[in-house]
């Protein structure tokens, strides 16, 4: 199927649930920060949860202290961004270009089968969106999931 069915939903409640699930993987010194307004967007809850949970759990693997943040910013009438930021070790430059390639041999960065980020990227596409690494961010790692509800 090309795209997921989208439905209008309150993302604040959804993100609270996702963060609660992800927090079970956080180290004790890591603070979970949720900054998501009470707005509705058209999305697919299950698909969105798969991406955000993966990114938050991956952040948890590489963050020993500080915080992991999940926020949402409305960029325009039909565009919003979910931003996942951590204060972890960051991603080595030589690996950044391979992150979204299936089976890139970066086992220290992803859990399990190496399919994580490429799969998340495909799910993002099916949600009318894109997933990318913010290369400008230097205090850890920041991923941006941009969704269009058109």
Task: Place the predicted regions along the sequence by residue.
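Short helix-loop "hinge" at the ATP-lid/N-box region of the Bergerat-fold HATPase_c
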Residues: 58-60
């Amino acid at each position: 199927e090309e795209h997921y069915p989208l439905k209008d939903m309150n993302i604040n409640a959804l993100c609270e649930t996702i963060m609660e699930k992800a927090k079970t993987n956080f180290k004790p010194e890591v603070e979970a920060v949720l900054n998501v307004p009470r707005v509705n967007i058209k999305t697919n809850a299950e698909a969105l949860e798969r991406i955000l949970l993966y990114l938050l759990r991956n952040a948890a693997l590489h963050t020993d202290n500080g915080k992991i943040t999940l926020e949402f910013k409305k960029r325009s009438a039909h565009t919003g961004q979910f931003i996942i930021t951590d204060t972890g070790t960051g991603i080595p430059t030589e690996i950044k270009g391979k992150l979204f390639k299936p089976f890139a041999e970066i086992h220290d960065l992803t859990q399990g089968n190496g399919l994580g980020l490429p799969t998340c990227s495909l799910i993002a596409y099916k949600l009318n969106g894109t997933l990318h690494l913010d290369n400008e961010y230097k205090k850890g790692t920041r991923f941006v999931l941009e969704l269009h509800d058109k």
